[in-house]
Amino acid sequence: MQWNVPKTVFRLAHRTCMEPHKAGLLGHCQNMKGPLLLYTLESRVVVVQGPQKRWLHLPTAQCVAKERKPFTAVQSQPGVFHHKQWEQDILSKRVLSSSATSSGPPSEKKEDPDPLQDRSISLYQRFKKTFRQYGKVLIPVHLITSAVWFGTFYYAAMKGVNVVPFLELIGLPDSIVNILKNSQSGNALTAYALFKIATPARYTVTLGGTSFTVKYLRSRGYMSTPPPVKEYLQDKMEETKELLTEKMEETKDRLTEKLQETKGKVSLKKKVE
């Protein structure tokens, strides 16, 4: 009986002293804004994350988090956690954008036919594309054929061929016809006028001569036969994909190195503190 009396008094005193502290702690946790960490520790120091960090020395601390987002443990390096998550988001966005860029099928691109064989475009466009692709062959052929055309017209003018009725017949403007009628330059101007009028025929002859010359040079082995356009596009897409993969690996390595450096700096600061 004597033993029970001090024990009962001790329990009453313990409840009287400790219950207000627990109630105050729970009320303080509810009034704090921001995420709170859940812990149940015995006689340890607990850090409560709120607008301000508070160190609490409690025999038993139980706080209820306002947000339902799970926290695995006390974040020993909160700065590193957010930095790592930010870098991972950037890396994933870069990977998705590069893969979306390189995932386009090469078959969707329109295949450009050989301009020497393409009859669906105008004569001038064919001449322009042929000049871009076979310029080294087209220029000599065009110069030779142009010289032949001009020489032929000049010879005809020397022989007294009157082109004025022909120009009037084809509907040439009167201003040009009058210049040829009253011109004192003679055969050269007449030959030049015929040379300009025959431009469509000259382009057609130039394209035909270029096609014949290209075939001849390829048969002799002086020009390489171009691969099919589809295979060419596939090869280009493979090269682009390899380059993008290498750049992605380099970017990933750099981000990993920066992350390791940041971890080292944060851990060093923690040790100093």
UniProtKB/Swiss-Prot annotation:
| Segments of this protein annotated with the region Disordered | 97-116, 247-273
For this protein, the parts annotated as crossing the membrane are 137-157
Q: Which InterPro entries match?
A: FAM210A/B-like, FAM210A/B-like_dom
Provide ranges: composition bias, Low complexity. Answer: 97-106
Q: Does the keyword Ribonucleoprotein apply?
A: no
What UniProt keywords are attached to this protein's entry? Coiled coil, Cytoplasm, Membrane, Mitochondrion, Transmembrane, Transmembrane helix
- One Pfam entry for this protein is FAM210A-B_dom
Q: Which domain of life is it from?
A: Eukaryota
Residue ranges of domain DUF1279 in the record: 118-230
Q: Cite the record's Basic and acidic residues compositional bias ranges.
A: 107-116
> A GO CC term?
membrane
Q: What compartments host this protein?
A: Membrane; Mitochondrion; Cytoplasm
- Identify its membrane topology class: Single-pass membrane protein
Please indicate if the UniProt record lists Secreted as a keyword: no
* Sections of the chain in a coiled coil: 230-269
Family in the record: Belongs to the FAM210 family.
This protein's assembly is summarised as: Interacts with ATAD3A.
What role does it play?
Answer: May play a role in the structure and strength of both muscle and bone.
Q: What is this protein called?
A: Protein FAM210A
Q: What is the protein's species of origin?
A: Bos taurus (Bovine)
